[in-house]
Design a protein with these regions (language model features):
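Residue-level detector of alpha-helix initiation sites
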Residues: 25, 237-238
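Conserved active-site-proximal phosphate/metal-binding subdomains
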Residues: 30, 88-110, 212, 217-232, ...
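Active-site entrance/lid segments in N-terminal catalytic domains of soluble metabolic enzymes
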Residues: 1-226
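Acidic, glycine-rich active-site loops and adjacent beta-strand->loop/helix elements
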Residues: 74, 204-205, 236-237, 259-260
């Protein structure tokens, strides 16, 4: 048998499996590898500046002639950056300086972990944290990314967070398929009303920003709410059995991220990939310590320190600015126990660092075996 659903026809692909647009990890090399293997590769462009996104799109087109997508964030609650660029300009104080207790907390954490001192405001700007992290999570940059997606006539666009409704008409005019990632039935209904082509039902099991509702419970409810709009299941799907289960729940394919994090082509460091291979099903935690919004990430001392403190994380983008120096210092020292990385509960199924095509092929073969065996659970008429 072969896996084929409406998703294949809508995206122009052979297999109804989509690489989730994971920031940093889902780079042109990984996206192209998944597309070349018959699935749909999606660039994780949340932290790309518009000009960098343009380069990523062009690089992906050099690596594949098959359909691919771009995933960005469209959060409604992000504050607008002040005139002059960046969430904190040269004349505006940093969030850490506005809230000295947060700076003190972070400074003590860095010293305790042997990560050096918390950078001064001038150092932060010199190293790009104030500009890069502050401006990246701004309304202006999100809108700039969308203009590049439209300019480049990307085959598929996915809103990893937020409602793409205001952009649907312009995207459709380009022939772009529009995908909306949702974590609640009400969001699915709103996405349908907005005219999206595909919905991703992303449950609590997923890495990154996700839903408070588990994947098994969320998917069928979103399928019912979506009507004729096809649904991809996401969250904790790490092998072919998960894909088969998603299809049985009414989804027409799977949106898979963490299973590809240890792919040879993935844009994360080797020490991070090795940590994923060694992880188990209990290796993740929900935390607001990185972006200010709830997200599932690999257990680490930064998230634990926030959980044990009396502080409420700052709103986006200020929490990212505060966490930036910690992440950068931890990555320089290759401290996977400190540097937070997004990942889902399916990481316990990651067994080795392998090519993306091999991972995809194994998932497909596993799904086919599972579906072929499903009739055996039915009782005979006699």
């Amino acid at each position: 048998m072969s896996l084929h659903t409406r998703i294949c026809d809508i995206f122009g692909i052979e297999i109804p499996i989509v690489l989730a647009g994971m920031g940093g990890a889902s780079n042109p090399e990984l996206a192209a590898a998944v597309s070349n293997a018959g699935g749909l590769g999606v660039l994780g462009a949340a932290t790309c500046r518009p000009d960098e996104l343009r380069e990523w799109i062009q690089r992906t087109r050099e690596l594949t002639d098959r359909p691919f997508g771009v995933d960005t964030l469209l959060p409604a609650s992000v504050r607008k950056a002040p005139a002059g660029g960046g969430a904190a300009s040269a004349t505006s104080p940093s969030p850490a300086d506005q809230l000295p207790e947060f700076k003190r907390f972070t400074t003590e954490f860095m010293e305790r972990e042997g990560l050096g001192e918390f950078p001064s405001e001038d150092d932060l700007r010199k190293k790009g944290f104030m500009e890069d992290l502050g401006a990246l999570f701004s309304k202006e940059v999100f809108e700039g990314q969308m203009e590049v997606v439209i300019e480049q006539k990307v085959p598929v666009y996915a809103a990893g967070l937020g409602n793409p409704g205001p952009w649907v008409d312009r995207l459709h005019a380009n022939g772009t398929v529009v995908v909306s990632v949702v974590g609640a039935v009400r969001h699915a209904r709103k996405a349908v009303e907005s005219g999206v082509d595909v919905i991703v039902a992303q449950g609590h099991d997923a890495g990154g920003h996700n839903s408070p509702v588990g994947t098994m419970a969320l998917v069928p409810q979103v399928v019912d709410a979506a009507g004729d709009v096809p649904v991809l299941a996401a969250g904790g799907i790490g092998d072919g059995r998960g894909v088969a289960a998603a299809l049985m729940l009414g989804a027409e394919g799977a949106w898979i991220g963490s299973a590809f994090l240890a792919a040879e082509e993935a844009g994360i460091e080797d020490y991070q990939k090795k940590a994923l291979v060694e992880a188990n099903e209990e290796g993740t935690v929900i935390s607001r310590s990185v972006t200010g919004k709830p997200a599932r990430l690999i257990r680490n001392s930064w998230a634990r320190a926030w959980e044990e403190s009396d502080f409420e994380p700052l709103p986006m983008p200020f929490q990212s600015i505060l966490a930036g120096p910690v992440q950068a210092a931890a990555m320089r020292q290759k401290r996977g126990d400190v540097a937070p990385g997004f990942a889902g509960q399916g990481i316990g199924m990651i067994e080795a660092i392998r090519p993306a095509a091999e991972i995809l092929r194994e998932i497909v073969e596993g799904a086919e075996r599972t579906l072929e065996g499903a009739p055996g659970f039915q009782r005979g008429a006699g």
